[in-house]
Amino acid sequence: MVTGRLTTTISQKTKVAQNNHLHIEFKKMSIQLNLDGLSFCIFNPGLSCIESIYHLSLPASMPPILVEQEVQKYLNEERALCQDFDTIKVLHNNEQFAFVPEKLFATEHLFEYLKFNVAEYRNQIISHDTLSGEKMINVYIPNAAINRVLRETYGIFEYEHFTTTLLGVLLMHNPQKKDAIYTHFD
């Protein structure tokens, strides 16, 4: 199955508190999927602060069905993760990606772009992000099982590959495109 970047805007949540005062929540959550687990960051833009950070460690050798169960269990147990969020962004941080020049990109060739970087890519969902200012496409394999658990829990959300976000931030700090070297340690 092939998909492009999935985007969702979850509408602002308005609730009536117990004392009948109108309460508006403006909270954002980002979730980073790494090879060793998931990290959750809840940000309150109204207060301009990070409210909480959580991490769920998962062994790389754990079977996918058990990973799904552990993630679902964790999401149900952590109260702060059980609330409504205005936006949710998921970053897939894995080595299963390839950058492709925009001029050479065609959705019917997604498998071809990954065949040199990814050992096992058949029967996988392949997605892609666009770095329009750089005229590049990042083709990658998201973790479909965890995306499914997150979709069942939160509804629709936006996801992209970690390197798309990282490259976007780095390039934002170098608008004149001067020679620069960046390193990232994971």
How would you label these PLM feature ranges?
Residues 2, 37-38, 49, 127-186:
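Small-residue (GG/TT-enriched) beta-loop-alpha framework at ligand/catalytic clefts
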Residues 2-47, 173-186:
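Gly/Thr-rich phosphate-binding beta-strand-loop-beta motif of the actin/hexokinase/Hsp70
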Residues 26, 47-53, 67, 85:
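A broad structural signal for short, well-ordered beta-strand segments within beta-sheet-rich domains
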Residues 29, 83-90, 186:
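Hydrophobic beta-strand segments of well-ordered beta-sheets in folded domains
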Residues 32, 90-93, 140, 183-184:
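Short beta-strand segments
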Residues 37-38, 57-62, 96-99:
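Short acidic, S/G/P-rich loop/turn micro-motifs used as interaction or catalytic elements
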Residues 42-63, 107-110:
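Extended intrinsically disordered, low-complexity coil regions enriched in Ser, Thr, Gly, Ala
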Residues 65-80, 88, 92-135:
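Internal amphipathic helical hairpin motif
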